């Protein structure tokens, strides 16, 4: 058992989309990374022989949750608007935990659609969902 104290700092998580650093992260979970493919699957045959297969689907889904006041909403909306017009709106995305060793980078990503919008007395959140091509991804500790 290690006696070393480990530290995570949310203000050391860098989100860069299309070369632009994002800011105005929501309180709580502000980035989620989900593998869309199955990775591996397995089955057992009638005689008990086990076989496994690898999914060729290398896509990931990334969700950035921002406060409604964040100017980064304008950046993501602009990328989506450009893609809607040109159909060529692919951009790189980088997520890096500078207080740890987790890094996610994809050369090609796109915004799926505009997030749902709610307005109230309080500051609301905007959850932007992106899909990426095959990334370089290291999920590690701090």
Report each predicted region and the residues it spans.
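Short, acidic/charged, Gly/Pro-enriched secondary-structure junctions
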Residues: 76-105
